[in-house]
Each structure stands twice: as C-alpha cells, then as structure tokens.
Amino acid sequence: PGAVSPMIAAGRVVKELYPDAMTVFVGPCMAKKKEAREEDIADAVDYVLTFQEVQDIFDAAGIQPELLSEDEKEHSSRAGRIYARTGGVSEAVKKTVEQIDPDKKIPVIPEQADGVPACKKLIERIQKGETEANFFEGMACNGGCVGGPKIIIKKEEGKERVDAYGDEAQYRTPLENPF
C-alpha cells in the first residue's frame, strides 16, 4: 500500500490505541472531506471540519477560544508541528532521516512545489529528469495548508505561527520523543 496523509495516519493511530474513539480532523482544507470518505482509507477519520466551520460553531455557542486556558502538547516534535507550511514536510523528513543515519550515503535532497501550477511544473521536471532532488513535496495550496481555502487568518500569519509553534517544541524529530 502507498503512503497516507498525516490526517489518515493520525486517525489510524488513534483508532488503534482507542478502538471506540471518534476521530475528527480540523483544518483549512476542503479536499480532506473527500479524502476521509475514500473507500480504502475511510476507517481512519469519522468527521472532517474546516477551521471556518469550527469558528461558526464557536460563534453560535458563544465560545471564545482566546479566553480558554491552553492545553500544552509537549509531546509533539518540531518536525510534526511544521507540516502545515510549504517546506515543512521536506524539512521534517530530511532532519529525521539525518538523525536516523547521519552517515547515509545518499542524502535527502528535497524540492518543494508551492501551489497547483508549481506542482504541475515539478512533475514535468521530474518526468524529464531535470532535478537532482530525491524527495518531493507538493503543496496544492500556496503556502501549504496555512494557505488553504478555509483559513481564518492570513497565510503569512499562519506560517509565522506554525514556525513559532515548531520552535517551541521540546523535541526536533519524533525520534527524540520518548512517548
């Protein structure tokens, strides 16, 4: 089987650890709603909500998240926290592989594409052998998930927040995480 998205992988882990759990993915991506219903992976995520839908629910219920106390997720690594922006997946994979095998004979050489037109061009370059990269990251939305269609803050602010959140992580990669 091929690789699955972080949404599906996380959903499957939760279902494995807590078989009766109901899983809900929240993000800026409309495509995740369709992905979660794909027959071969529909077991992982029960519901998908966009940031805008969650904001609408909060508004209707009178919930003001900024007034709630924070719940620190000290167990997540920087590598996991920066996936949401272009270059985040590449950086996470490169750093983790380097940590697994620092003397690796074939280094990870990433290349990113930001937005659908750039993804198409990257695919064409790969097919023509016009790149030295051996790991490819394609983000359909400009800026990555932080630029998705249902964002509720500007993508530039989203990228800054993702990077800051990554910088706060206790662990650089999942390998350092004892949990």
Name every feature range the model reports, one short phrase each.
Residues 1-179:
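Iron-sulfur-associated redox domains of electron-transfer enzymes in respiratory
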